[in-house]
Design a protein with these regions (language model features):
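Hydrophobic helical h-region of N-terminal Sec-dependent signal peptides
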Residues: 8-13
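Bacterial N-terminal signal peptides that target proteins for export
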Residues: 1-7
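Short hydrophobic alpha-helical membrane-anchoring segments
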Residues: 14-19, 450
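N-terminal, post-signal peptide beta-strand-biased segments of exported outer-membrane/organellar beta-barrel
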Residues: 6, 17-144, 502
Length: 561
């Protein structure tokens, strides 16, 4: 079973904003030409520095430059249902109901927003004779900031049980303090997360035109990773005794009251024992049998009272200590951590053209590297400064073809295969994938006249999510369809303006799973007879429905020198 505690640290480390139109960890939208026609691997153009570097060798002699700027907006949406079978037929069976969940099934909707105001990239090539010297730069992963202002299901599940757990303890509080309080009915918390992830990729390489039909490419991309995460879970509260109360302060007030009562009982015990000792001293000094018996009887009563008060003080003090330990679980928590790492991706390419056809392939090797924590604050004690985490970039095999239907009309198709299962991820998460990511791409391009070209394309992305173990509400993707369209407009003799828009329709992925949440401590008798305290857990039934939205608007300029 999945065991859950407070999850702020895991949430922040796992959360990473992505702007991808590609695999699990890859941005392939590296040019505006791509945004209006996704099947670019089989095409020949300056953006081929990324998509079809071997084909760039077939461009005219001289310098070629492409500048690209994109604006990206995403949402991540989760509908979560959560039940506790042990609390069936009570107000706490569907705990999310106590904080705005659906009144029927307790489901609750969560949304995170991510935006990238400007996502830049460029490609440049210098063709001389049969050689093509190339460079490209872009954010090949991440690229923006994601913000979750209202938390996530994994944040809230453990907190949502607090009213039920508090109500279980109210009789104990009443007995120890002599106070009666009405049961807890609702809960609340304030949570904030922001995450930034950047994979800066600088690609260098050389293509060689073997003949007028065949060219090859060899190069590499230097990847520099920078991630930054900040977050907090604060003001965990519940409506207890008719008032919404911060639980850390509430528990502290009970601890103080219990300690005061324990001290008072101990004072009574000392006073009673002192009186008992004094009466025994008097009894030892008297010779009157009747008086001695009366004094000893009174001393025994005081001594018994002292023992009772001492036992009571011990019991109350134990309750205070237990509650003092419990309050640590609801105190405010903060995390601020950044991560850095780097790796080099070797890249090979080939392009072959014959008649009206052009065929191309690109292979990027899996990039092995780690990212290192730079922790400024970690109240969770989960992310030690200097610890390294696997963060491999999956290899890619990209295949493409283009066919010239007419002089002014071209159709394209492509296939991308991401070797996700070969890329090491944190906690070996890649082992939960059923298969590697696959993409199928198609597009069409039409030259309306020598100055205006329009195009459109589609992409089908299939992730190997299996039964959903790979997914969490902290980091998820779902299979999708993307559609893009746009135009290339000649604005000068040697310059073209590219404009494009694309959007992605994500499928809903339903994940059903069992879980367990810590619900305090319980005494457990070991085989050798010793008694130890162990976490007490409650089994849970969980359903998460994941989906996303993605919209990208871009503009770029291609210049030939």
């Amino acid at each position: 079973m999945k065991y859950q505690k407070t999850v702020l640290a895991a949430a922040l480390l796992a959360m990473a904003t992505t702007t991808q139109a590609g695999g699990l960890l890859t941005n392939t939208n590296q040019s505006i030409a791509f945004n209006r026609n996704f099947a670019r691997v089989g095409a020949i153009g300056i953006d081929g520095v990324y998509f079809n570097p071997a084909g760039v060798a077939f461009l005219d002699q001289g310098f070629h430059l492409s500048l690209n700027f994109q604006n990206v907006y995403q949402t991540r949406e989760i509908t979560s249902t959560f039940s506790v079978p042990a609390l069936a037929n009570t107000p706490y069976e569907y705990p999310f109901k106590l904080n705005g969940g659906n009144t029927t099934d307790g489901s609750k909707f969560y949304q995170g927003k991510a935006s990238v105001p400007i996502l830049p990239s460029f490609q440049v090539a210098y063709n001389k004779d049969k050689w093509s010297f190339q460079a490209g730069f872009g954010l090949t992963g991440g690229g923006g900031k994601a913000t979750f202002n209202d938390g996530l299901p994994s944040f809230e599940r453990s907190v949502s049980l607090l009213p039920a757990l508090i109500n279980q303890q109210l009789p104990t509080f009443s007995a120890l303090l002599g106070q009666n309080e009405t049961p807890a009915t609702t809960y609340s918390l304030q949570s904030y997360m922001s995450g930034q992830q950047y994979n800066f990729g600088l690609q260098l390489g050389v293509a060689y035109k073997i003949n007028e039909n065949l060219s090859v490419f060899g190069g590499a991309r230097f990847n520099y990773i920078y991630n930054k995460y900040q977050g907090s879970i604060t003001n965990i509260s519940a409506n207890v005794g008719g008032n919404n109360q911060n639980l850390y302060d509430y528990f502290q007030s009970k601890v103080n009251a219990l300690n005061e009562k324990a001290s008072a009982l101990q004072t009574q015990a000392v006073a009673a024992q002192t009186q008992a000792d004094a009466l025994r001293a008097q009894a030892n000094q008297t010779t009157d049998p009747t008086a001695k018996a009366q004094l000893l009887a009174a001393a025994d009563q005081y001594a018994a009272g002292a023992q009772k008060a001492t036992a009571g003080a011990k019991l109350v003090r134990a309750g205070a200590d237990k509650l003092d330990s419990s309050k640590e679980k609801v105190k405010d928590r903060y995390l601020e951590v950044s991560q850095r790492g780097w790796g080099i991706t070797p890249i090979l390419g080939i392009d072959y053209r014959t008649g009206k056809w052009n065929f191309a392939a690109r292979y990027e090797f899996t990039t092995k590297f780690n990212i290192e924590n730079n922790t400024k604050r970690d109240d969770t004690k989960k992310y030690e400064n200097g610890v390294n985490t696997p963060n491999d970039i999956p290899g890619i095999l990209a295949l493409g073809a283009q066919y010239e239907v007419l002089k002014n009309l071209r159709v394209m198709a492509g296939y991308n295969h991401y070797f996700d299962k070969d890329a090491r991820m944190d906690n070996d998460k890649q082992r939960f994938l059923k298969h590697n990511t696959q993409e199928f791409l198609a597009g069409v391009e039409w030259d309306i006249n020598p100055s205006v070209t329009v195009s459109a394309g589609g992409q089908r992305t299939l992730y190997g999510l299996g039964d959903g173990k790979y997914l969490t509400d902290l980091s998820f993707v779902t299979s999708s369809y993307s559609f893009g369209f746009g135009a290339k407009i000649k604005v000068a003799k040697n310059a073209h303006l590219n404009v494009a828009y694309f959007f992605t329709n994500y499928s809903n992925f339903k994940k059903e799973y069992d879980g367990a949440i810590e619900a305090g401590q319980e005494q457990v008798t070991q085989p050798n007879g010793t008694v130890t305290m162990q976490p007490k857990t409650l089994a849970t039934k969980n359903t998460d429905i994941f989906t996303r939205t993605n919209k990208v608007l871009g503009v770029g300029l291609d210049i030939d020198f």
